[in-house]
Amino acid sequence: YTCNKGLQGIIYSGNIVIDSILSNGLANLENRGINLKCSIIIPPSLNIADVDLCILFGNLIDNAVEACERIVEPGRKKFIVLNVNIKKDYLFIDIANSFTGEVKKQNNIYRTVKIDERYCGIGLFNIRKIVEKYNGEFSVSHSDNVFSVSVMLSLLWGKK
């Protein structure tokens, strides 16, 4: 299934859990000046727990949207590019977004750039835990104005 924004901004990929998370998390992007491009080619069901899909996609989307919203320079493009697909027995998720260019790293781990850090910065930690659970891989990178996260999860998890 391919990601298409239908009536009222609802995303249809064919997977109801992912559709719900993305439709909610990516609602009203146009009104916030954020351009969205996405391609989601997945089956209706995956061998990944729904709660893990919610945590994974929820954190990825929230981080991308919040990073775009921190851009305040007039005329600066705000965007999110999301690609989700399956190759062999793996789910691949790649998300890239514009951001201010400000990065905080401590012991080679990305930290939040939010002012109130008490309840922030656990999103990437939660993503890493899910990646470990599904014998996957996880990478984070950035250039001057683009922040990218790539996730690969095994769909053979729990199968004997």
What feature does the model see in each segment?
Residues P74-D89:
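Short beta-strand/loop element within the Bergerat-fold HATPase_c
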Residues V65-R76:
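A short, flexible helix-to-loop-to-beta junction within the catalytic ATP-binding CA
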Residues I10, L36-F57:
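Conserved short strand/loop->alpha-helix "switch" segment adjacent to the catalytic nucleotide/phosphoryl-transfer site
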Residues G101, S143-S150, L156:
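Glycine-rich nucleotide-binding loop
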Residues D89-G121:
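Glycine-rich/acidic phosphate-handling loop/turn and adjacent ATP-lid/helix
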Residues T2, G14-N31:
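Short beta-to-alpha transition helix within the HATPase_c
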